Amino acid sequence: MSILDNTILFVKENLQNAEAGHDWFHVERVYKNALLIANAEDCNLEIVKLGALLHDIADSKFHNGDETIGPKLAREFLESQKASEEVISHVVNIIENISFKGGNFEKKFTSNELDIVQDADRLDALGAIGIARTFNYGGFKNRPLYLPNIAPNLHMTKEEYKNSEAPTLNHFYEKLLLLKDKMNTETGKKIALERHKFMENFLSQFYAEWEGGK
């Protein structure tokens, strides 16, 4: 089998018991998004595919905040597949730099391939799927839906963002609604804008229902 086929099997096996917002189906959606975006970008498609498939192989949220496990697993797997060091290091850099970590985070590595995979991942945090994933994770962490007296914190450090226990609805303001202005590619920006509008409409409906209207 090809390295791509083996990577798919590896990811499916490792994520078979993952939280629903970060499972194989999330990875598959990101993979499809990445292929769509890559059609309009100058990139190494093999690195885009591998980066998309391996980007959440060990999300730090589910490993006590340890950000080294995912890159380590990816490197070990790609080495077992006899991938070149150039490909391995690039994919590892994508995994290390893809995540949103609060408003003050700057990427330490840049490439067209990272831009594509990052946009693909961010798109899955937007729109209807993004809303579903957000409330699924909030339920997983046993967080309240909304507490009117707890305002969103838009200026969190990386550590504050990672350790936040805020109500689920705050996440829209602390991350999701910020993403459309953080997209890297023209294709990503266009899709993000439509999904952003969907979320704004959802929030308007949510608040109306919270107050007993509509």
Place the predicted regions along the sequence by residue:
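Basic/polar N-terminal segments that are highly enriched at the extreme N-terminus
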Residues: 1-2, 214
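An amphipathic alpha-helix signature
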Residues: 4, 8, 31, 71-75, ...
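Generic N-terminal amphipathic, Lys/Arg-enriched alpha-helix
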Residues: 6-17
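Divalent metal-dependent phosphate-bond-processing catalytic cores, especially two-metal-ion Mg2+/Mn2+ enzymes
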Residues: 15-24, 28-41, 54, 103-214
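Alpha-helical phosphate/pyrophosphate-handling elements in metalloenzyme active cores
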Residues: 18-48, 60, 69, 73-81
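His-Asp-centered metal-binding catalytic motifs of divalent-metal-dependent phosphohydrolases/nucleases
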Residues: 45-62, 70, 91-101
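Hydrophobic, well-structured mid-protein blocks that either form specific transmembrane helices
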Residues: 81-118
